[in-house]
Amino acid sequence: MHLVFKFSPEADLETMLKLKVEINTREHESLYGIRQYPFEIDCRWHQAKAEILSFEPEELFGTKLRALLQRRKNRDLFDLHEGLKQLSMDPDKLIACFVHYLALGGKPISRAVAEQRMLEKLDRSLTEDIAPLLPAYIQFNDDDAMDAFGNVWSELIARIKGDPWKLSGQVIDELRKGKIPNLLR
């Protein structure tokens, strides 16, 4: 199931964008269970407190890693990087969730495939699909995207079980000689 929202980004009010929100109604097996989280709204016109049910952060971001590696979109890279920075997640627990949800779907992704797909993402912009979605006060430029790429690579991709992609070293060296001299340094 999905919902589509149309909006104008803050940076360009003349443009209309569509944001598709996908709701996964097929996966019902949680690896770490459901938790309650406090939620509070406090603004001029409404105040409320509630407990909301959700998954552990590692579980949510494990599916985010799966999305990053299964789709051509790069906005998941931003989300993973911010989650790793802000939520003090356990990367090994996140990878366990990633593996769990891949197994449920019957579509495993090895470390070699993960490395190949990540490096292929460098053939196009890492920022173009996220930039219009961010508020004006959040910057995510090409340098930020490369930091995010390196963080996700070292904290998550390198932890996926299996052998590295046999061409990773060669592709990284070529990219360092070309357009990305500081790649994964």
Name the predicted role of every residue range:
Residues 1-185:
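Structured mid-to-C-terminal alpha-helical surface segments
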